[in-house]
Amino acid sequence: MGDKSKAQKKRLAKAERQNTRVPAWVMMKTDMNVTRNPKRRNWRRNDLDE
């Protein structure tokens, strides 16, 4: 991949933070109306449009 610029590292770090499941307390609070995160991404299958 080569050298990453600071801006690119920042974007990748944000994408990594966003790539988490919905917290259990959110599921409980919404009575299981919110159970999945539509922005979940797999590093091998999905692209980030970098």
UniProtKB/Swiss-Prot annotation:
GO terms for MF: structural constituent of ribosome
Coiled-coil regions, chain positions: none
InterPro entries per record: Ribosomal_eL39, Ribosomal_eL39_CS, Ribosomal_eL39_dom_sf
SUPFAM superfamilies named in the record: Ribosomal protein L39e (SSF48662)
Pfam family, one: Ribosomal_L39
One of the GO BP terms on file: translation
Region of interest (Disordered), residue spans: 1-22
Superkingdom, taxonomy of origin: Archaea
PROSITE patterns: RIBOSOMAL_L39E
Statement: the UniProt record of this protein carries the keyword Ribosomal protein: yes
GO cellular component, as recorded: cytosolic large ribosomal subunit
Keywords, in A-Z order: Ribonucleoprotein, Ribosomal protein
Assigned protein family: Belongs to the eukaryotic ribosomal protein eL39 family.
Name used for this protein in its record: Large ribosomal subunit protein eL39
Species, as recorded: Halorubrum lacusprofundi (strain ATCC 49239 / DSM 5036 / JCM 8891 / ACAM 34)
